[in-house]
Amino acid sequence: MIEPHGGKLVNKIATEEEKNEWLNKSKELKSISVTYFDLSELENIATGLFSPLEGFMTKEDYDSVLNSMRLSNGTVWSIPIILSVKKEIADELKVGEDVLIKNQEDSKEYAILHLQEKFERRKEEEALKVYKTQDKAHPGVKFLYEQGEIALGGEITLLNRIEHENFQEFRFDPKDTRKIFSEKGWKTIVAFQTRNPIHRAHEYLQKTALEIVDGLFLNPLVGKTKDEDIPSDVRMKSYEVILDKYYPKERVFLGVFPVNMRYAGPKEAIFHAICRKNYGCTHFIVGRDHAGVGDYYGTYEAQEIFDQFKPEEIGIVPLKFEHAFYCTKCESMATAKTCPHGKEDHVFLSGTKVREMLSKGEKPPKEFTRAEVAEILMEYYMNK
């Protein structure tokens, strides 16, 4: 089994005894209330999905990630994982204190932050270095500018898990997926990330990858996404039906990716690959404009960024695929590498194009998506 990033799978979940100890003295602790976004980041640190991180970044790691895509110890890491609050809240907290973290929705106690450092979040610089733009029309940049200006760095202890309302049967921590892959006898596993329903281009990439590995981990993102993205429950329904009818059941595994979407393109592709390595995957499919939005990134920039590192530094193999299309002359899916015909014979597929058709009440053709998936999507759009 592939090693977790940094060599060790982090576990910051309190034992029952530790949890009771912290809760018994919770009234003596200062507390801060945070959003669901922050709670999910906390949980992903605690379960080891963000290994080797053991908490929210300190200034040294923050600076290093912005400037070199590495933690201060040299480990590759491309996205800042930050807990930030308004200055007046930060002023009440002292470095060295244990701070109780609550959910701002219901005041439930979720974690302890062992406050190591307070520092200013340089939002303009962060926007440029992570997202390559300071344009507030970019959803990741907009979200960044809405956050507090002071970052709180330090290790965490998770007291309670988030009580998710959906997909319980598809939620797996890295320790779970590693055990499952091992029990299945899979030595090589390819992960596929998506925030769209599976169309024929996705299916083509997944099945091409499945020819060279033991198993496919279909890992759709169910964290925070853009409002116009198709809801995760509709997408999950489409994944279940397509896996049931068109994939070999013993060679695929479906589990959700509980991470918030940042739309950081190339840098997010590295981050997504590292998370899948922590799940136990050996390969990761990187298609065109991975984690992109609008025209902020080049078509294959998310693939090219992997070339900036030695393969062993990231440790998971990126499978770089060109834009797949349906060729009317070949009568099959293909890419420019496998099809000799001109663009006039190519039907290009994208989640955006499918969404456009559905919003107009048009059923996507079979070259776009399987009929069963089209029906699920049509039903959703008709009931919107």
From Swiss-Prot:
GO biological process: hydrogen sulfide biosynthetic process; sulfate assimilation
EC code(s) of this entry: 2.7.7.4
Enzymatic reactions: sulfate + ATP + H(+) = adenosine 5'-phosphosulfate + diphosphate
Nucleotide-binding listed as a keyword: yes
Enzyme class: transferase
MF annotations from Gene Ontology: ATP binding; sulfate adenylyltransferase (ATP) activity
UniProt xrefs under SUPFAM superfamilies: Nucleotidylyl transferase (SSF52374), PUA domain-like (SSF88697)
Gene3D superfamilies reported for this sequence: HUPs, Sulfate adenylyltransferase
Pfam families with a match to the protein in the record: ATP-sulfurylase, PUA_2
Keywords of the record: ATP-binding, Nucleotide-binding, Nucleotidyltransferase, Transferase
Involved pathway(s): Sulfur metabolism; hydrogen sulfide biosynthesis; sulfite from sulfate: step 1/3
InterPro entries linked: ATP-Sase_PUA-like_dom, PUA-like_sf, Rossmann-like_a/b/a_fold, SO4_adenylyltransferase_pro, Sulfurylase_cat_dom, Sulphate_adenylyltransferase
Family named by the database record: Belongs to the sulfate adenylyltransferase family.
HAMAP family xref list: Sulf_adenylyltr (MF_00066)
Protein's name in the database: Sulfate adenylyltransferase
